[in-house]
Amino acid sequence: MIKQRTLKRIVQATGVGLHTGKKVTLTLRPAPANTGVIYRRTDLNPPVDFPADAKSVRDTMLCTCLVNEHDVRISTVEHLNAALAGLGIDNIVIEVNAPEIPIMDGSAAPFVYLLLDAGIDELNCAKKFVRIKETVRVEDGDKWAEFRPYNGFTLDFTIDFNHPAIDSSSQRYAMNFSADAFMRQISRARTFGFMRDIEYLQSRGLCLGGSFDCAIVVDDYRVLNEDGLRFEDEFVRHKMLDAIGDLFMCGHNIIGAFTAYKSGHALNNKLLQAVLANQEAWEFVTFQDDAELPLAFKAPSTVLA
């Protein structure tokens, strides 16, 4: 059978919090089968757990948060969640000694390296996928996102940014998902923001960790980072990275075709909730062997080495 995945060993890293600008220690721990993805704040006494759940997601101007019933939150979970989706990690406990996951370089790549350093272990329990059975679409003005039935996982994302630094030909990105494709094509794409927004937020004591080290920064005319872009279409690739993380908030890889136009965290989450709320639109599936498994989710040698 296709088995659930966790880590082989505990790994730790430090980084800076986007909101506070302070040092954060991140610890990733293996977890037993059927634990799911659990974020844990160890700076609170007692520690507070936040299971990944579409209904717990709140979108703020700076990041995605998980909020519990007592209005306690953990922030900036989206890029790590994308790395978990990319490598198909089903069970993990993620600890931080702060109210937020460190921003690292603004992409998912540092988290991918950390997960691969921990090693991926298979558990003796069937991995559950969410398979889309009916088309579900959500809209917000001219923005929209939808899932259609498809035996695999494809993503097709279009942005519409009128900015000299973003070429009109680099506003759409489509790909057939796989762990390899995620690592090579998506994981290194960084978040982006306007210099004026960062300066304004910092003047109000917010976004204190925001810098050229953890984002693509633009003014009205150009990219300000000395090293420029990692990809010509890094902006839309990062929006796809965000979507992969947002859609994994159900804790399961999804089998279906995702298409979006000008979508963001809030609309991606609205789509995920709309799918899960309609029992006719999806089902849990497991697979007995690789022959049945959609190509998108076959583990590359780098993951299960």
UniProtKB/Swiss-Prot annotation:
UniProt-listed Enzyme Commission number(s): 3.5.1.108
Location of the active site: H265
Disulfide bridges in this chain: none
Domain of life: Bacteria
GO CC term, one of those recorded: membrane
InterPro entries per UniProt: Ribosomal_Su5_D2-typ_SF (IPR020568), UDP-acyl_GlcNac_deAcase (IPR004463), UDP-acyl_GlcNac_deAcase_C (IPR011334), UDP-acyl_N-AcGlcN_deAcase_N (IPR015870)
UniProt keyword terms in alphabetical order: Hydrolase, Lipid A biosynthesis, Lipid biosynthesis, Lipid metabolism, Metal-binding, Zinc
Pathway, per record: Glycolipid biosynthesis; lipid IV(A) biosynthesis; lipid IV(A) from (3R)-3-hydroxytetradecanoyl-[acyl-carrier-protein] and UDP-N-acetyl-alpha-D-glucosamine: step 2/6
Coiled-coil annotated spans: none
GO BP of this protein: lipid A biosynthetic process
Cofactor annotation: Zn(2+)
One example GO MF annotation: UDP-3-O-acyl-N-acetylglucosamine deacetylase activity
UniProt cross-references to Gene3D superfamilies, sorted A to Z: lpxc deacetylase, domain 1 (3.30.230.20), lpxc deacetylase, domain 2 (3.30.1700.10)
One Pfam family hit: LpxC
Residues that bind Zn(2+): H79, H238, D242
Catalysed reactions, as listed in the record: a UDP-3-O-[(3R)-3-hydroxyacyl]-N-acetyl-alpha-D-glucosamine + H2O = a UDP-3-O-[(3R)-3-hydroxyacyl]-alpha-D-glucosamine + acetate
Xref: NCBIfam families: lpxC
Function: Catalyzes the hydrolysis of UDP-3-O-myristoyl-N-acetylglucosamine to form UDP-3-O-myristoylglucosamine and acetate, the committed step in lipid A biosynthesis.
PANTHER family cross-referenced by the UniProt entry: UDP-3-O-ACYL-N-ACETYLGLUCOSAMINE DEACETYLASE 1, MITOCHONDRIAL-RELATED (PTHR33694:SF1)
Entry's family note: Belongs to the LpxC family.
Identification of the protein by name: UDP-3-O-acyl-N-acetylglucosamine deacetylase
Organism for this UniProt entry: Salmonella arizonae (strain ATCC BAA-731 / CDC346-86 / RSK2980)
